[in-house]
Amino acid sequence: MDNDIKAWLFDILSAIMEIESFFIDRPKEFKKYQADIRTKRAIERNIEIIREAMSRILNRDQSIEITNSRKIVDVRNRIIHGYDSVSDDVIWGIIIRHLPVLQIEIEKMLGE
């Protein structure tokens, strides 16, 4: 694996860890997330970072498979190009369902 891909994988992992850090001192509760605009915007920004790094990886090496990469790319595009069309439910689904899987995959890739 080339050094650029490793760096982008670390970017993804760092963004996931930052998102997780918002929930260290409190449980992951949708209502609290929904009411906290600063946390929502910070998470959206980290999803943008994840998407950009993921896009660069896939452009460099199309043989790399990342689960749900298309969904993450699509959500990032909706964040960038239409804030009003990104529902809290969609972002929350990424936080709860997709990021834990992505974190495991990235850690495994970095460990190889």
Segments and roles (model prediction):
Residues 1-112:
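Solvent-exposed interaction patches of small proteins and small membrane subunits
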